[in-house]
């Protein structure tokens, strides 16, 4: 039950992992969004997060017109949902109590996209 085995599992799925204090941050290669995995003893919280650079990143994609940004965001969220299923199994198998909080992050990201689309289309 080493955290290194968890990191190895995440990396094997194509993600980059950063460790800071009691937290692992799983980065996505397409968008500046990430999963934060926060440890507190035998409890762990997994949440979908992003930083301020996401707004500018989405604005640039929308203005370039080169991608369907909504589809891209949904794909990234879907990939993180799949990874979270693997994380859930790993944590349960290793005796952790897990609290998954992806929905809040999903809603925040989709609201950000809607705001940007309203501004750029209006």
Please report, for each region that a protein language model flagged, where it lies by residue:
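Amphipathic, interaction-prone secondary-structure segments
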Residues: 13, 17-43
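Beta-strand/loop substructures that line and gate deep hydrophobic ligand-binding cavities in soluble
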Residues: 34-59
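Intrinsically disordered, low-complexity regulatory regions enriched in serine/threonine/proline
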Residues: 53-122
């Amino acid at each position: 039950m080493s955290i290194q085995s968890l990191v190895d599992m995440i990396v094997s799925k194509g993600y980059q992992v950063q460790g800071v204090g009691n937290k692992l941050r799983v980065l996505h290669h397409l968008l500046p969004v990430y999963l934060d995995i926060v440890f507190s003893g035998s409890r762990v919280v997994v949440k979908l997060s992003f930083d301020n650079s996401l707004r500018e990143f989405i604005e640039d994609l929308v203005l370039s017109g080169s991608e369907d940004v909504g589809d891209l965001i949904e794909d990234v969220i879907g990939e993180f949902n799949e990874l979270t299923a693997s994380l859930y199994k790993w944590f349960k198998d290793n005796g952790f109590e897990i609290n998954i909080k992806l929905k809040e992050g999903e809603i925040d990201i989709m609201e950000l996209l809607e705001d940007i689309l309203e501004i750029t289309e209006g």
